[in-house]
Amino acid sequence: MSDHKRAVLAGGCFWGMQDLIRKQPGVVSTRVGYTGGQNDHPTYRNHPGHAEAIEIVYDPAQTDYRALLEFFFQIHDPTTKNRQGNDIGTSYRSEIFYVDEEQRQIALDTIADVDASGLWPGKVVTEVSPAPDFWEAEPEHQDYLERYPTGYTCHFPRPGWKLPKRAEV
């Protein structure tokens, strides 16, 4: 376990994010929760300022942070502020919560690549912030789409979506 790394991402409703990210190669575990808000021990009904987020534990021998971010930018729209599909509000913002300086720099570089690529019609509005406390969501929200495969989601892989680095654009 000590060789594993941690990532925290917010990109809209956490159900769809978790369902897709947990299936990625190198992802060891995921859990959904709340982060970046004003209260301790937030709940689904009381999480002022918090984003719905996913905490990812991954094996860096099988994947890297950049690959996770590239998939993150593929499955949600990073150009809409405080919104994903029908979900509107700061809970559904696009935000990368970095755990160290290396993650911060990779996040900024990846955002610059997304902006330069033209894969999304507008500029990226994803925020990049230090990772505050992560509060695990209630059990009914964990692995929601695994239990309810036809449940609500606004996250989708985009076939053929490949993010080039700026030097390759």
Curated annotation (Swiss-Prot):
Enzyme class, first EC level, given as a word: oxidoreductase
Catalytic activity entry: L-methionyl-[protein] + [thioredoxin]-disulfide + H2O = L-methionyl-(S)-S-oxide-[protein] + [thioredoxin]-dithiol; [thioredoxin]-disulfide + L-methionine + H2O = L-methionine (S)-S-oxide + [thioredoxin]-dithiol
EC number annotated for this UniProt entry: 1.8.4.11
Biological processes annotated in GO: protein modification process
Keywords (A to Z) from UniProt: Oxidoreductase
Entries under Pfam families matching the protein: PMSR
Active site per database record: C13
GO function term, MF aspect, one: peptide-methionine (S)-S-oxide reductase activity
Domain of life: Bacteria
Family matches, as InterPro entries: Met_Sox_Rdtase_MsrA_dom, Met_Sox_Rdtase_MsrA_sf
Similarity-based family: Belongs to the MsrA Met sulfoxide reductase family.
Protein purpose: Has an important function as a repair enzyme for proteins that have been inactivated by oxidation. Catalyzes the reversible oxidation-reduction of methionine sulfoxide in proteins to methionine.
Listed name of the protein: Peptide methionine sulfoxide reductase MsrA
